[in-house]
Curated annotation (Swiss-Prot):
One of its GO terms (cellular component) is chromosome. It catalyses: S-ubiquitinyl-[E2 ubiquitin-conjugating enzyme]-L-cysteine + [acceptor protein]-L-lysine = [E2 ubiquitin-conjugating enzyme]-L-cysteine + N(6)-ubiquitinyl-[acceptor protein]-L-lysine. It holds the Pfam family zf-C3HC4. InterPro entries: BRCA1 (IPR011364), BRCA1-associated (IPR031099), BRCA1_serine_dom (IPR025994), BRCT_dom (IPR001357), BRCT_dom_sf (IPR036420), Znf_C3HC4_RING-type (IPR018957), Znf_RING (IPR001841), Znf_RING/FYVE/PHD (IPR013083). The gene is BRCA1. Pathway: Protein modification; protein ubiquitination. It comes from Gorilla gorilla gorilla. This is Breast cancer type 1 susceptibility protein homolog. It is an enzyme of class 2 (transferase). Residues 230-267, 311-338, 650-739, 1181-1216, 1322-1395, 1440-1505, 1565-1598 are annotated as: Disordered.
């Protein structure tokens, strides 16, 4: 290198310091678009917008906590110049040093440059060259397969030419040269160019003179390249002489040369393996050489890329090559030496190599010794530099150690010493064991570069480059090599027979089996070096990296080894290794597959050398393909094999990249990391068994190649593979991990996951964090998974499963951080189980714990830093947060909201930007991971993980692909539609796989298994259900994906997939559990999956809860079969959404992150919660005649979902700000992930519904239909409340934020009393007690209704709970109403079956009885507000229903139908998760023909709102604790009034007032102000009031519920129900008008066709509004028009808003300018509330209570600008002039277009309005007065006058006019 290592280090340190200064404190990335705040802090514009979007109103500066607003942000051009200069410096540094500055920031840039060029050239070249080569390969003989593998179907000379050309191409693109080198046959010139560039013309010339033959004629570089290829000996020798500068060129040239030479040699000596290997090596060298030569930086980058491509390939090739040439005596050493040989003594030794391939290989090794040492030292320095710069140090040490561990490290070092100066050597070393981390670095950098390139290439060529081991046409050449090895081999591997010739050839060539690999490792000859390398590499990361390419085993080993190697520098290594593995790994996997088969075929010892060489070459090619392709997107490879799925995945990947602003590289890395993880996973599998490995690899291969398809087949394969036995299940898990990784394009992630697991073993927290830095996007999600994994680590096996699950779940980016940790844990623990203990441990041992710890601590600090500001750009934050959470569960909880919010926002942004594109993918990763992890953690980690993981894999992969489209799932609900079709197949596949997984899981989790199985079967059996499930899943995916894309989107999506796949309540439960986290997961899982454990865990709940659990399972299964499938589907959808929502929070939250003890605590809490929930549900179930089992299960589910919510609440409680952050998450869930949040609650409700639905089917079906909304909602609310309660209890014993102390009581009571034992009345009592209001009344009501009022009691419970949840459960209550609405009796009734109708009739009869009882109770307790509150609510509702059963029913039906419509509407808009969720709800409703389904649907809606609110409100409600009680009292009073006055209105009003109080209070209590731009806080506020409403609403809600029952009754036939619903809308309107005199306005409006616009709302909130509008048939427009009747503003609790154009126009037009709370409260109450109570009172500028909107609305006959002629002159910012003119026109003014148009006359008052700050000419507006005799005022005069709706005096706003002479 030009600079000494020390010098380079110093420079890099300086650059690093500069970079740190110039990085955004929020996202920790180089600030791309710097904006400065008032406090002079610089942030990314993206981060700040994300932060500001989180909270409406002033947000706080993350650094100084000063208030910041969007207006206060100013672009900092100077800072951006600094960043640009820094990037230039880094670029120059890279060019000067030939080293890639390992940095995510630079990666992106370099990737953009080099990858694009490479993509272009490589694409073209590769496509042509590879294809032709592929054809040639196909034509060529088995010996050619090696050539084929290299993509050198060309003759030996052809190989040389190709190499040269490739090198040339590499040089030409230089940064892109990596791709190009494999690009075309005619890349000799390029190769030569590449060689000359960095290496230097002199040395090249030297090389060329010595080695020049024909190619010397080419320019030095070309000559060198040609020499490399043609003049093998000469070139090699020349290269050796010029080791320092030519090192890169030399090495590359050497590599090329050996390849070429060997190619010639092969043709000459006919040693195809050698030739092939040489060629592969050449390609690698070529790549390295070209890249390095190109410019050290570029070359190194390319080299990194090459290493990424080649490390596995090159190493494997080198290993095999070395093994083949060296006779495999020191296979390990030979491979490293071989490369080194080529590098150090390329000419002589290569000649020897070529001629004396075996003999010379040893010679080279000896020769290599010194150079290797030198090279190692230099590489070490470089690595240290990289480590300091990014994360290479640990890797370097590991690699060095590994190399040394490998036989000939010393020799290699010697050889490398000669070549060490140049990066190419380094790369070789990297390829060898010596410089693994540099290889990793190179790879990671290349991954970054190639990721971008690949993205572009993928876009252009459909992921062709992904497997660009040799050529861009990975599908072609890779098909020859990779398709031959990848496709053919996957087939063979899948089949396990040596079906393909190529495979056979490879196997024969490779002679490497997973077993052979181990055996060969024992062998001392040719096999030994490579085999040992593989074995040792598995043990020693260095060898493993190289060996991965050698065989499938090696691949796995490589993954492990890489992980280990990387582990020393956990983040750097992992990141780079991820990148490296991503590129190399998919190919590696392909190659591994190939090699596995080759190994199998390679049983022949004689041919082993040649075969290995061939295999090595092929492997190298495959790796290279992967490097270039995987580098881009692992999905590219997948695309090639499975272009459709791949396409989706590519999209997914691209989207992942796109959504994450700075995360493209990281995401790519993440995507690739899963592949790495997969490899690692494969490796354990491999070790476990060849067959397993094969299966794993085929899956991986298929995953990589076919993507989605691969997933499917692989999944089936996995299913089969897993089904056979638990070990297989584990294997399947691994396979799935591989599959998910590859499919999800997470080879790296998986690999990283594995590696990180090692790190995690060292430092769970650290490793979690470690991943975070590496993963920018997926990391966020990864973190939670990681954290979970970390926690799981404590639970070795569960963690193991979790890790794999994490890998699956976070196939995108989560796995990067999480999976790695998990994976290593998994490997450490699971592998021990999976026979990979040695490797895992070895890896762990290999990695220096101190290094890992240090790295992880650093990462942790980084994570902490990021965690402080969880923004969209914090892709790694979730991971980091997770890491932190791992250490601090509370912290996690707190941050998890952030992460969730981040994810949500990310998702939101992504959804917005690529709502139909990619958010889901990341979401998939994130969501899937947390879900799986958590799900797996408690009970069947391995199995759950595997199952969940498998499902997640498929789900996330298919979904990933689908979510690639659905990626915006949260936002891009639309994508689900795209993906729904894929989802169906995916679902089917996932279902199948999940089913098998579930079956296996069932073995362990008996009850769970049946349910899951049932769910799976149910889904398959019910196509419509499946489609619904798919839709729902899609919706859920969208929602959950929106949820977790923001954090748990992936999880949810995966969870959704799993749920859908499992299509079982248990699945949902598991998902919920997973999402929720270990606590709930353990709880639910133990309870549900393992009733015994659950029983044990649940002391109080032991008897019933386990029983319930089992029963639940059975019943759930039954429900799933009978009523559950649709319901479950909807539940799944809902649940995943909710789960996602909660999962994000909880998953990140301590649930999974909690230690086992913590988990146990959580579990106990969860159990209590479940107990509580079960009790509630049991009560409901008992009353509703739902079996307790289903209800407990439902409750458990609900508890899980809500529990997760509670956890969030917990974190909220613990950290109000965190809660706010979480709240935004929920809000995002609500809007971007609206569906998700409600989905969770809905899910729970759906689960409850499912359980209920079963019982209901028996007897409660009708009641369920009517009660489904009510009772289910009640249960939901109750359960959610209970869940919240238990979670809250867990968190802070204030599940119902409105009753913290009561919550404790409730929890205590619930805990003390078995939920089932408690019975409804007891539960009701508890709830009442919790509420503290109407406890006795509720008990009375419960007792009275207990038998007959299942629904009523449910309502009461719900109300009670809602009132208890009070504000906290307001969401639930609202949910109840929403549920009713959502249940959309119309759709519900529509779907009602005859059985349901009968059941409904029975239920209606019971309801009537209950109503009578209620009336009696109400009469008795009418004067007892506190006691009769719940009763009153229920009673009033019942009474109301009794009084106006039709009306109430109609209303409820209307609400339901509206809600349903709204949901579907949301669904249609889809941009929001809520919409999708709504779709799900709707589909759920429509498709849920059974009450459960209906219930699910209603649940869903409420969940959407309620859950959102529940979570928001949880903390809020806790804060609202007191308001809640007050509200309860108020509500009681109101209810009494209601009873007197038809309560709904009063309730609404009263409840609204308390709500306002609550809103204010909760927010204040929460420390969140709606205005603080915290969507969550808003929802909290909203929910707080809604909680109060819930308390109040109960009467109306009950009424709604009862009417709904009646509606169901009246609509006992689906048609009738539908009619009722459809008619119900009008009826509801009427009933609203009747019941709510004050609601008359809105009712009238409803009758009159309302039209509304929204302003200042987040996407989640907008989705909620959209649903609301849809439900109430309100037109929702983007722009305010004359027809607009309502302007919905985002306000704080005091109804103070920001001034927006719509705000002004709404006031000027006399519209209803109402708070967003109006929508949320109306949704909660299930009816349109009176706008009066929600009218905006003021704004932040003109005063908080100026009543301008009211004044304007009531003074439309008195226009404030009447008689004025106003000319809006000049430019205006933030609003078009025509809008300003319209505004003044609406206020009565006459608009004058030109100053000259003013008419002078009496009674006319001309005014000129200008905006001085919009004028570019400083004094232009000062001379306006010269043109007309009119006063000139600022625009503020208009705005202030309009806002206050009072014409302001002009004096304050006059602009002094300068005389014309002065102008």
């Amino acid at each position: 290198m030009d600079l000494s290592a020390l010098r380079v280090e110093e420079v890099q340190n300086v650059i690093n310091a500069m970079q740190k200064i110039l990085e955004c404190p929020i996202c920790l990335e180089l600030i791309k678009e710097p904006v400065s705040t008032k406090c002079d802090h610089i942030f990314c514009k993206f981060c700040m917008l994300k932060l500001l979007n989180q909270k409406k109103g002033p947000s706080q500066c993350p650094l100084c906590k000063n208030d910041i607003t969007k207006r206060s942000l100013q672009e900092s051009t100077r800072f951006s110049q600094l960043v640009e200069e820094l990037l230039k410096i880094i670029c120059a540094f890279q060019l000067d040093t030939g080293l890639e500055y390992a940095n995510s920031y630079n990666f992106a840039k370099k990737e953009n440059n080099s990858p694009e060029h490479l993509k272009d050239e490589v694409s073209i070249i590769q496509s042509t060259g590879y294809r032709s080569r592929a054809k040639r390969l196909l034509q060529s003989e088995p010996e050619n397969p090696s050539l084929q593998e290299t993509g050198l179907s060309v003759q030996v000379s052809n190989l040389g030419t190709v190499r040269t050309l490739r090198t040339k191409q590499r040089i030409q693109p230089q940064k892109k040269s990596v791709y190009i080198e494999l690009g075309s046959d005619s890349s000799e010139d390029t190769v030569n160019k590449a060689t000359y560039c960095s290496v230097g013309d002199q040395e090249l010339l030297q090389i060329t003179p010595q080695g020049t033959r024909d190619e010397i004629s080419l320019d030095s570089a070309k000559k060198a390249a040609c020499e490399f290829s043609e003049t093998d000996v000469t070139n090699t020798e020349h290269h050796q002489p010029s080791n320092n500068d030519l090192n890169t060129t030399e090495k590359r040239a050497t590599e090329r040369h050996p390849e070429k030479y060997q190619g010639s040699s092969v043709s000459n000596l006919h040693v195809e393996p050698c030739g092939t290997n040489t060629h592969a090596s050449s390609l690698q060298h070529e790549n390295s050489s070209l890249l390095l030569t190109k410019d050290r930086m570029n070359v190194e980058k390319a080299e990194f890329c090459n290493k990424n491509k080649q490390p596995g390939l090159a190493r494997s090739q080198h290993n095999r090559w070395a093994g083949s040439k060296e006779t495999c005596n020191d296979r390990r050493t030979p491979s490293t030496e071989k490369k080194v040989d080529l590098n150090a003594d390329p000419l002589c030794e290569r000649n020897e190599w070529n001629k004396q391939k075996l003999p010379c290989s040893e010679n080279p090794r000896d020769t290599e010794d010194v150079p290797w040492i030198t090279l190692n030292s230099s590489i070490q320095k470089v690595n240290e530099w990289f480590s300091r710069s990014d994360e290479l140090l640990g890797s370097d040490d590991s690699h060095d150690g590994g190399s040394e561990s490998n036989a000939k490290v010393a020799d290699v070092l010697d050889v490398l010493n000669e070549v060490d100066e140049y990066s190419g050597s380094s790369e070789k070393i990297d390829l060898l064991a010596s410089d693994p981390h540099e290889a990793l670095i190179c790879k990671s950098e290349r991954v970054h570069s190639k990721s971008v390139e690949s993205n572009i290439e993928d876009k252009i060529f459909g992921k062709t480059y992904r497997r660009k081991a040799s050529l861009p046409s990975l599908s072609h050449v890779t098909e020859n090599l990779i398709i031959g090895a990848f496709v053919t081999e996957p087939q063979i591997i899948q089949e396990r027979p040596l079906t393909n010739k190529l495979k056979r050839k490879r196997r024969a060539t490779s002679g490497l089996h997973p077993e052979d690999f181990i055996k060969k490792a024992d062998l001392a000859v040719q096999k030994t070096p490579e085999m040992i390398n593989q074995g040792t590499n598995q043990m020693e990361q260095n060898g493993q990296v190289m060996n991965i390419t050698n065989s499938g085993h090696e691949n796995k080993t490589k993954g492990d080894s890489i992980q280990n190697e990387k582990n020393p520098n956990p983040i750097e290594s992992l990141e780079k290794e991820s990148a490296f593995k991503t590129k190399a790994e998919p190919i590696s996997s392909c190659i591994s597959n190939m090699e596995l088969e080759l190994n199998i075929h390679n049983s022949k010892a004689p041919k082993k050398n040649r075969l290995r060489r061939k295999s090595s070459t092929r492997h190298i090619h495959a790796l290279e393909l992967v490097v270039s392709r995987n580098l881009s997107p692992p999905n590219c490879t997948e695309l090639q094999i499975d272009s459709c799925s791949s396409s989706e995945e590519i999209k997914k990947k691209k989207y992942n990249q796109m959504p994450v602003r700075h995360s493209r590289n990281l995401q790519l890395m993440e995507d690739k990391e899963p592949a790495t993880g997969a490899k690692k996973s494969n490796k354990p599998n491999e070790q476990t068994s060849k067959r397993h490995d094969s299966d794993t690899f085929p899956e991986l291969k298929l995953t990589n190649a076919p993507g989605s398809f691969t997933n499917c087949s692989n999944t089936s394969e996995l299913k089969e593979f897993v089904n056979p036995s638990l070990p297989r299940e584990e294997k399947e898990e691994k396979l799935e991990t591989v599959k998910v990784s590859n499919n999800a394009e997470d080879p790296k992630d998986l690999m990283l996951s594995g590696e990180r697991v090692l790190q995690t073993e060292r430092s769970v927290e650290s490793s979690s964090i470690s991943l975070v830095p590496g993963t920018d996007y997926g990391t966020q999600e990864s973190i939670s998974l990681l954290e979970v994994s970390t926690l799981g680590k404590a639970k070795t096996e569960p963690h193991k499963c979790v890790s794999q699950c994490a890998a699956f779940e976070n196939p995108k980016g989560l796995i990067h951080g999480c999976s790695k940790d998990t994976r290593n844990d998994t490997e450490g623990f699971k592998y021990p189980l999976g026979h990979e203990v040695n490797h895992s441990r070895e890896t762990s041992i290999e990695m220096e714990e101190s290094e890992l710890d240090a790295q992880y601590l650093q990462n942790t600090f980084k994570v902490s830093k990021r965690q402080s500001f969880a923004l969209f750009s914090n892709p790694g934050n979730p991971e980091e947060e997770c890491a932190t959470f791992s250490a601090h569960s509370r912290s996690l909880k707190k941050q998890s909201p952030k992460v969730t919010f981040e994810c949500e926002q990310k998702e939101e942004n992504q959804g917005k930007n690529e709502s139909n594109i990619k958010p889901v993918q990341t979401v998939n990763i994130t969501a899937g991971f947390p879900v799986v992890c958590q799900k797996d953690k408690p009970v069947d980690y391995a199995k759950c993980s595997i199952k969940g993981g498998s499902r997640f894999c498929l789900s996330s992969q298919f979904r990933g692909n689908e979510t690639g489209l659905i990626t915006p799932n949260k936002h891009g609900l639309l994508q689900n539609p795209y993906h729904i079709p894929p989802l169906f197949p995916i679902k089917s596949f996932v279902k199948t796989k999940c089913k098998k997984n579930l079956l296996e899981e069932n073995f362990e989790e008996h009850s769970m298994s049946p349910e899951r199985e049932m769910g799976n079967e149910n889904i398959p059996s019910t196509v419509s259900t499946i489609s619904r499930n798919n839709i729902r899943e899609n919706v859920f995916k969208e929602a959950s994906s929106s949820n977790i894309n923001e954090v748990g989107s992936s999880t949810n999506e995966v969870g959704s997939s799993i749920n859908e796949v499992g299509s079982s309540d248990e699945n949902i439960q598991a998902e919920l559990g997973r999402n929720r986290g270990p606590k709930l997961n353990a709880m639910l899982r133990l309870g549900v999956l393992q009733p015994e454990v659950y029983k044990q865990s649940l002391p109080g709940s032991n008897c019933k809860h386990p029983e319930i659990k089992k029963q639940e399972y059975e019943e759930v299964v039954q429900t799933v079969n009978t009523d559950f499938s649709p319901c479950l589907i909807s539940d799944n959808l809902e649940q995943p959404m909710g789960s996602s929502h909660a999962s994000q929070v909880c998953s990140e939250t301590p649930d999974d992150l909690l230690d086992d003890g913590e988990i146990k605590e959580d579990t106990s809490f969860a159990k209590n919660d479940i107990k509580e929930s079960s009790a509630v549900f049991s009560k409901n179930v008992q009353r509703g005649e739902l079996s307790r089992s289903p209800s407990p299960f439902t409750h458990t589910h609900l508890a899980q979902g809500y529990r997760r919510g509670a956890k969030k609440l917990e974190s909220s409680e613990e950290n109000l700000s965190s809660e706010d952050e979480e709240l935004p998450c929920f809000q995002h869930l609500l809007f971007g992930k609206v569906s998700n949040i409600p989905s969770q609650s809905t899910r729970h409700s759906t689960v409850a519904t499912e359980c209920l639905s079963k019982n209901t089917e028996e007897n409660l079906l009708s009641l369920k239909n009517s009660l489904n909304d009510c009772s289910n909602q009640v249960i939901l609310a109750k359960t959610s409340q209970e869940h919240h309660l238990s979670e809250e209890t867990k968190c802070s014993a204030s599940l119902f934020s409105s009753q913290c102390s009561e919550l404790e009581d409730l929890t205590a009571n619930t805990n003390t009393q078995d939920p089932f034992l408690i019975g409804s009345s007891k539960q009701m009592r508890h709830q009442s007690e919790s509420q503290g209001v109407g406890l006795s009344d509720k008990e009375l009501v419960s007792d009275d209704e207990e038998r007959g009022t299942g629904l009523e009691e449910n309502n009461q419970e719900e109300q009670s709970m809602d009132s208890n949840l009070g504000e906290a459960a307001s969401g639930c209550e609202s949910e109840t109403s929403v549920s009713e609405d959502c249940s959309g009796l119309s759709s519900q009734s529509d779907i009602l079956t005859t059985q349901q109708r009968d059941t409904m009739q029975d239920n209606l009869i019971k309801l009537q009885q209950e109503m009578a009882e209620l009336e009696a109770v109400l009469e008795q307790h009418g004067s007892q507000p506190s006691n009769s509150y719940p009763s009153i609510i229920s009673d009033s509702s019942a009474l109301e229903d009794l009084r106006n059963p039709e009306q109430s029913t109609s209303e409820k039906a209307v609400l339901t139908s509206q809600k349903s419509s709204e949901y579907p509407i949301s669904q249609n808009p889809e941009g929001l998760s809520a919409d999708k969720f709504e779709v799900s709800a709707d589909s759920s409703t429509s498709k849920n023909k059974e009450p459960g389904v209906e219930r699910s649907s209603p649940s869903k809606c409420p969940s959407l709102d309620d859950r959102w609110y529940m979570h928001s409100c949880s903390g809020s409600l806790q804060n609202r604790n007191y308001p809640s009680q007050e509200e309860l009292i108020k509500v009681v009073d109101v209810e009494e009034q209601q009873l007197e006055e038809s309560g709904p209105h009063d309730l609404t009003e009263t409840s609204y007032l308390p709500r306002q109080d609550l809103e204010g209070t909760p927010y204040l209590e929460s420390g969140i102000s709606l205005f603080s731009d915290d969507p969550e806080s808003d929802p909290s506020e909203d929910r707080a009031p809604e909680s109060a409403h819930v308390g109040n609403i109960p009467s109306s809600t009950s009424a709604l519920k009862v009417p709904q029952l009646k509606v169901a009754e009246s609509a006992q036939s689906p048609a009738a129900a539908h009619t009722t619903n459809t008619a119900g809308y009008h009826a509801m309107e009427e009933s609203v008008s009747r019941e709510k005199p004050e609601l008359t306005a809105s009712t009238e409006r409803v009758n009159k066709r309302m039209s509304m616009v929204v302003s200042g709302l987040t996407p989640e909130e907008f989705m909620l509004v959209y649903k609301f509008a849809r439900k109430h048939h309100i037109t929702l427009t983007n722009l305010i028009t004359e027809e607009t009747t309502h302007v919905v503003m985002k306000t704080d609790a005091e109804f103070v808003c920001e001034r927006t154009l719509k705000y002004f126009l709404g006031i000027a037009g006399g519209k209803w300018v109402v708070s967003y709370f109006w929508v949320t409260q109306s949704i909660k109450e299930g009816k349109m509330l009176n706008e009066h109570d929600f009218e905006v009172r003021g704004d932040v500028v003109n005063g908080r209570n100026h009543q301008g909107p009211k004044r304007a609305r009531e003074s439309q006959d008195r226009k404030i600008f009447r008689g004025l002629d106003i000319c809006c002159y000049g430019p205006f910012t933030n609003m078009p002039t025509d809008q300003l003119e319209w505004m003044v026109q609406l206020c009565g003014a006459s608009v004058v277009k030109e100053l000259s148009s003013f008419t002078l006359g009496t009674g006319v008052h001309p005014i000129v309005v200008v905006q001085p700050d919009a004028w570019t000419e400083d004094n232009g507006f000062h001379a306006i007065g010269q043109m007309c005799e009119a006063p000139v005022v600022t625009r503020e005069w208009v705005l202030d006058s309009v806002a206050l709706y009072q014409c302001q005096e002009l004096d304050t706003y006059l602009i002094p006019q300068i005389p014309h002479s002065h102008y």
